[in-house]
Amino acid sequence: MSPASAASAESARVVSVAAGMEKTDRATPVRDGRHQALAVLIGNWINEGATVATADIPTAAIRTSDVYEWVPGGFFVVHTAFGKIGDTSVGGVSIIGVDGEAYDDTFYDSFGNAHRSRLEIDGDVHRWIGVDGRARCTVTMTDGGMTQVAHHESSVDGVTWTASMDVVLRKVI
């Protein structure tokens, strides 16, 4: 075996061992267009907007910094966020990965909660739909992918939806 093919075989084995698949019949994942569709998110973003006032709660300003980065290998995106909603410090981290023709996104917030969403991408429109049926967000990418216009909604019954916040994220890097 030539040194080049030995190195290639060793590299393939390392990938299989790291993925826990060395002795399974699972196919090694292949990065494809579904992964590439997430590339528009990659970068540093400044998020500004406000919550939508209710009869009981006034509007609160939102200002956060969001960073989307590829996890090594390019199969997953990690999203970190921190900032303020009103006077409250907020933050968290999520991992976004391919799940069939859509994506799974689990966000772990600074209050100890985990929020699972299904992300669907249709051209410049990205829709996050909470698996619990209580939250959803529609993002329209504009300015060649440099701006995200996001409309968040919540529901107590999964049928009737109420606007909860509107924000604009601008890519700074």
What are these regions (language model features)?
Residues M1-R63, V67-E69, V168, V172-I173:
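Amphipathic/hydrophobic helical signal segments and adjacent flexible N-terminal regions
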Residues T28-H35, N47-G49, A53-R136:
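Central antiparallel beta-sheet cores of small beta-barrel/beta-sandwich binding domains
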Residues I57-T59, V159-A163:
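Beta-sandwich strand segments
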Residues P72-G73, D143, I173:
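Residue-level recognition of beta-strand termini and adjacent short loop/turns
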Residues T140-M146:
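Beta-rich strand-turn-strand
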Residues T147-H151:
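Beta-strand/loop substructures that line and gate deep hydrophobic ligand-binding cavities in soluble
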Residues E153-S155:
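Conserved Ser/Thr-centered positions that define the repeating blades of beta-propeller domains
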